[in-house]
Structure formats: structure tokens, C-alpha cells
Regions:
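A short, N-terminal "cap"/entry segment at the start of jelly-roll beta-barrel domains
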Residues: 1-42, 48-50, 116, 123-127
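Short strand-coil-strand connectors
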Residues: 26, 69-73, 94-96
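A short, polar/proline- and glycine-enriched secondary-structure boundary/capping micro-motif
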Residues: 42-44, 78-80, 110-114
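Short peripheral tails and domain-boundary helices/loops at the edges of structured domains
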Residues: 105-125
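Short, conserved beta-strand element in jelly-roll/cupin
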Residues: 51-68
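Ligand-binding loop in jelly-roll beta-barrel domains
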Residues: 87-112
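Short acidic-glycine-tyrosine-enriched beta hairpin
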Residues: 70-89
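Residue-level detector of beta-strand face positions
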Residues: 22, 65-67, 90
Length: 127
């Protein structure tokens, strides 16, 4: 049975200001995530269908405040809440946030690929 504490999973930076400790357990990614206040992930998921993350996420927000934007509505998650985020969303961090999240790995890899592409493009235009 896989198990791990926060410090046993390698820290990886997905994009500037967005770091995560994540590992795959049988097709599900387990991630301890941190994001800074003011970060709007909308630009990071451009290029995905509808320019939104298509991965579902289940998790627990330890601290912070997150706004989840869908095409037809917006939802808010606050520290101390468990959550489910359906596919087709973009996330904005209103406060420094820390979460434990579970996501199907294949869907998450598509999202990470878009984030890395968009981050690289943004960094090359800054030069």
C-alpha cells in the first residue's frame, strides 16, 4: 500500500510561483500543492479545450482561498474545506494556499504539458 508524508515526495516547480510535491499511485496523482496569492491560472491552461483544465480534482484545502471559474458559474473554496473540482475550470488563488489533491494522472499530465508550454512561451517573451 503506497503512503507518503509531505516531505517524502520530491518538490517540483510546475511554473513560477506554483510548486507541487506529487507522485503517481496506480494512475492517480497524489499532490501536496502550494500556490501564491494573486496567481491566476487562466493563462497557464491556454491551449487546452475551452482554455480550461480538463482534469477532475478531489482534495482538501489546508489554508488559503481559491476561486474556481467555470463557463457558467464561479465557486469559492476556503481553507478547511474538502472539495471536488469538475473538468472545465480555471483557478485563481486569492490567498497563499496549500492543498492535498488527488487527480487522474493522464488528465493531469495534459494540463501540466499546457502549463509548461505556456510558462516557457511567457519566459521567452520576457527576454
Amino acid at each position: 500500500m503506497p503512503s507518503a508524508s509531505h516531505d517524502q515526495i520530491e518538490l517540483q516547480e510546475i511554473a513560477p510561483g506554483y510548486s507541487s510535491r506529487f507522485t503517481d499511485w496506480g494512475g492517480i496523482t497524489v499532490a501536496f500543492e502550494k500556490a501564491h496569492a494573486g496567481q491566476d491560472a487562466s493563462a497557464m491552461v491556454r491551449g487546452l479545450p475551452d482554455d480550461r483544465c480538463q482534469a477532475p480534482h478531489w482534495g482538501f484545502l489546508f489554508s488559503g482561498k481559491i476561486v474556481v471559474h467555470f463557463d457558467d458559474h464561479t465557486e469559492t473554496i476556503e481553507g478547511g474545506q474538502a472539495y471536488y473540482i469538475a473538468p472545465g475550470h480555471a483557478i485563481e488563488f486569492l490567498e497563499d494556499s496549500e492543498a492535498l489533491e488527488f487527480t487522474p494522472t493522464a488528465a493531469l499530465e495534459q494540463t501540466f504539458a499546457a502549463i509548461r508550454r505556456n510558462s516557457a512561451a511567457a519566459n521567452s517573451s520576457d527576454v
